[in-house]
Amino acid sequence: MAVVHRILRRGLSAASPLPSLRGLLLVSPQELGRRPASSSSSAAAAAGDVEAELRAAREDVRQLLKSNPCHPILVRLGWHDAGTYDKNITEWPKCGGANGSLRFGVELVHAANKGLLKALFLVIPIKSKYAGVTYADIFQLASATAIEEAGGPKIPMIYGRADVADGEECPPEGRLPAADPPSPAEHLREVFYRMGLSDKEIVALSGAHTLGRARPERSGWGKPETKYTENGPGAPGGQSWTSEWLKFDNSYFKEIKERRDEDLLVLPTDAVLFEDSSFKIHAEKYAEDQDAFFEDYAEAHAKLSNLGAKFDPPKGISLE
């Protein structure tokens, strides 16, 4: 873990020179925990071992969340690893997606990933305990568990994702959503359609902004602090989308629709959910019906978490 501590002290930024960061791994190769190839006779036993490790890792994430209100950044970690997927590229891992590539410095310095080094620092100690759990899996497990522990729906997850081997396999910058594009609706569709997601899934996934805050020093958006964030929990400051920003519910849609509180954040890509006719159908529904939102969100989150993933075994590993 010495490499992690050294990086945290030094810091990473979008301005860091890529030649010195390209291919940078946050842990040593010995800690990678990549599963060796197994014969058919031992595959079932190996899968059973991995399942047990995944269950233990999930419990560790739950314990982390009890002591550290880091739900939002863990959700973001899983999303940003998976959200680089391009359905038009068939070759793995060039297609991007949930493949653990976000652990490399060359991808961490993408502007959209600013601040995610802190999330890696939270999950790497858990990952390092379980040799059979990949980075791709721990990122998605942490994300789904954070949603559930914040009061959200149970996500129908599967595991067994393969990791990319090095930073040379990271996706190019620019595949993740921006907060203030010239045409918000067009931008959201360009990004999410590239992943193979629908208008309904765009709106449902946007509802995860019920968790967390925007910080101007990271994204350029949000107030330095508000009455909802000035005292934490966790590090104080930033501007949240909802008043209870560690609780997963449908309040994001209610607040975006009403826009009555200046202390709550509304990005252009939030506002457009009630401005675009196709998006509005779903946003209105979710503002009125939390159960419908939870059902659609769980399905969309699971779909996102599988994008671009290569599973071993091919059908994945369920913990339910």
Curated annotation (Swiss-Prot):
GO terms under biological process: cellular response to oxidative stress; hydrogen peroxide catabolic process; response to reactive oxygen species
Sites where the protein binds heme b: H209
Alphabetized InterPro entries for the sequence: Ccp1-like (IPR044831), Haem_peroxidase (IPR002016), Haem_peroxidase_sf (IPR010255), Peroxidase_I (IPR002207), Peroxidases_heam-ligand_BS (IPR019793)
GO cellular component, one term: chloroplast stroma
Locations listed in the record: Plastid, Chloroplast stroma
Region of interest (Disordered), ranges: 213-241
Presequence boundaries: 1-42
Binding, K(+): T210, T242, D249
Stretches with biased composition (Basic and acidic residues): 214-228
Active site: H80 (proton acceptor)
Keywords from the named record: Calcium, Chloroplast, Heme, Hydrogen peroxide, Iron, Metal-binding, Oxidoreductase, Peroxidase, Plastid, Potassium, Transit peptide
Tissue specificity field: Expressed in leaves, stems and flowers.
GO MF, one annotated term: peroxidase activity
Induction line: Down-regulated by hydrogen peroxide in leaves.
Annotated site, Transition state stabilizer, chain positions: R76
The record's free-text note on cofactor binding: Binds 1 heme b (iron(II)-protoporphyrin IX) group.
Membrane-spanning parts: none
Catalytic class of the enzyme: oxidoreductase
Pfam families: peroxidase (PF00141)
Family per similarity comment: Belongs to the peroxidase family. Ascorbate peroxidase subfamily.
PANTHER family in the cross-refs: L-ASCORBATE PEROXIDASE S, CHLOROPLASTIC_MITOCHONDRIAL, THYLAKOID LUMENAL 29 KDA PROTEIN, CHLOROPLASTIC-RELATED
More info: Binds one cation per subunit; probably K(+), but might also be Ca(2+).
Name of this protein: Probable L-ascorbate peroxidase 5, chloroplastic
Organism expressing this protein natively: Oryza sativa subsp. japonica
